[in-house]
């Protein structure tokens, strides 16, 4: 009797030079240090993340540099595991724009796995995740689309936690303002 192991990988690895050319075409290469460009390329390559599919982004605002994984990437990896049985995300509460810390807007994700007896439930609160400008007011996205933004945080965190084997080690998603973020 022979045992065969078949490995399936649908990683669409983008060649390093194409990623570098893309950074240049998006005018990001001139904003990033050589070390930041190399870090971005290494992470994209190591995890099979394709910037052309918007699976990974680079964000540079002032001297701050972040590598951001799109929340859809976590969902795709959960689906590919064959263990995802369903999910839903809902919001409750309201926003007090005069005192954001008093807001009780919450997004809750419920994820069902085929190999678990109980659903995974995770909640995040607007007051804890709202991204602010230097003056303390919510940035454009969080001001204009607060429900969408808090749902995206719940989804990214929920799938990352519930499918840690599939998503472990990926850079954490961050919901930042397009005013301060350059997408790749």
Identify the meaning behind each predicted range.
Residues 1-178, 182:
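Glycine-rich anion-binding surface patch
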């Amino acid at each position: 009797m022979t045992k065969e192991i078949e490995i399936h990988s649908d990683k669409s690895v983008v060649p390093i030079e194409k990623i570098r050319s893309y950074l240049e075409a998006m005018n990001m290469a001139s904003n990033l240090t050589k070390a930041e460009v190399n870090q971005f390329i290494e992470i994209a390559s190591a995890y099979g993340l394709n910037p052309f599919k918007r699976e990974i982004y680079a964000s540079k605002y002032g001297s701050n540099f972040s590598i951001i994984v799109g929340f859809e990437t976590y969902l795709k990896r959960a689906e590919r595991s064959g263990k995802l049985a369903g999910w839903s995300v809902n919001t409750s509460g309201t926003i007090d724009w005069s005192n954001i810390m008093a807001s009780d807007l919450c997004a809750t994700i419920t994820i069902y796995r085929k190999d678990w007896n109980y659903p995974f439930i995770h909640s995040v609160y607007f007051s804890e995740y709202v991204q602010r400008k230097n003056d303390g007011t919510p940035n454009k996205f969080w001001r204009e689309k607060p429900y969408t933004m808090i749902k995206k945080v719940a989804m990214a965190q929920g799938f990352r936690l519930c499918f840690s084997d599939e998503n472990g080690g990926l850079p954490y998603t961050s919901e930042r303002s397009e005013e301060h973020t350059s997408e790749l």
